[in-house]
Amino acid sequence: MTSSPVPPTNSSDSSDSKVWSQRFESALNPVIAAFNASIHFDIALIEYDLTGSQAHVQMLAHSGIISQAEADAIDQGLEAIRQEYRQGQFQPGIEAEDIHFAVENRLIELIGDTGKKLHTGRSRNDQVGTDLRLYLHDQILQVQTLIRNWQQALVILASDHVQTLIPGYTHLQRAQPISLAHHLLAYFEMAERDWQRLREIDRRVNVSPLGLGALAGTPFPIDRQYTADKLGFADLYRNSLDGVSDRDFAIEFLCAASLIMVHLSRFSEEVILWASEEFGFIKLKDSCATGSSIMPQKKNPDVPELVRGKSGRVFGHLQSLLVVMKGLPLAYNKDLQEDKEAIFDGVTTIKACLEAMTILVAEGLEFQTPRLESAVGEDFSNATDVADYLSKQGVPFREAYNIVGAVVKTCLSQNKLLKDLTLEEWQQFHPQFADDIYSAISPRQVVAVRNSFGGTGFTQVQNALEQAKTLLSQSK
């Protein structure tokens, strides 16, 4: 079945015809009906709802609960609804209450009483849990792809800046010079943890609750493993009460999403700072910046500012779902309807932010190399290397540290940098200072000697780049 002469029902004039309405003596108040409905947002689950229902009816036939002919008719009817939805012809209103009733009602319109057998051996409680897990599994894979794209953009940019120096900061005070590529690859590592975290979470998402019923299982001889295999689930819930009420997987996803946004927001903050006149480390290219309505000279970093701001949305969704879950008795409660908008918007937000930040890194940032080079040579961020120099001459490090503190204090009082001191002045502080002190404290040498594993030394950074490229190539 690919089409039907039966027109889809899109009106909202049947609010008293709920599936459950025979239990009640009067119709639901229209305001309460609208308040109760979730169709306006859980329509996002329709493809997964249809897929889950198709697996369910084939299981019913496989288990001898309905005939194969009935299962095939239902399956074809569900596929017809899928095509109607994709063509914009199936647009249920609030009279449907939720996507599950909307699909079931439309199925009965299309194929008649056989459609009433769809829900045999199933509750909306295990049905929605199945839909949500199928949706989230799919979205996790998409987010992981976007993370890889973000990492790829970072690697490409870092490849151009292994030899570019930039001040490294602690407490937002200049600390030690580093390779710009090393700085960019720090975000690659954060993103890799994000990717791995999602993989771990997906193991717990990919567990089937289908067939658990409302809360206690079902008396029908169903085969839960059959539907799990059909839908690609790796495991089954072992307790019906837990399975229909569990939203740990959703909370875990929002935790992971929040960490993704933390990392994107941190990078955004740095881009905003670096693009300011006060730093002047980067210029934003026209394709990734906007202007002011009143100040014609402005070029605003809207992309990183929006990402920084949108992080709060995702954090809020995590908090809201934690609060929803904290007081719920077993098993299902209507409060759980509140999980979907948090998840849907969380997914939409992180996907949009990853896409935007990938474009920003790939084409929107122009590092001002001369400014960066001058920035690492106009301060005392090489002071640690003076202490290291003395330590290598046999001076205990703490003693060397105190000597260098006195050197810096003297330089500040005389408005000098370390490189401006004469050898005679150096030797007034300690006789071990020699001519090679000048090369030892040059910014490029300061970076080059930090060649321990994971350090900013140029050799280490190049090795890290190659490892990152290998990781990305292996994950394709």
UniProtKB/Swiss-Prot annotation:
The keyword Lyase applies. Keywords: Amino-acid biosynthesis, Arginine biosynthesis, Cytoplasm, Lyase. InterPro entries: Arg_succ_lyase_C, Argininosuccinate_lyase, Fumarase/histidase_N, Fumarate_lyase_CS, Fumarate_lyase_fam, Fumarate_lyase_N, L-Aspartase-like. Its EC number is 4.3.2.1. GO terms for molecular function: argininosuccinate lyase activity. It catalyses: 2-(N(omega)-L-arginino)succinate = fumarate + L-arginine. It is found in: Cytoplasm. It comes from the Bacteria. GO terms for cellular component: cytosol. Pathway: Amino-acid biosynthesis; L-arginine biosynthesis; L-arginine from L-ornithine and carbamoyl phosphate: step 3/3. GO terms for biological process: arginine biosynthetic process via ornithine; L-arginine biosynthetic process. The keyword Lyase applies. Belongs to the lyase 1 family. Argininosuccinate lyase subfamily. This is Argininosuccinate lyase. It comes from Acaryochloris marina (strain MBIC 11017).
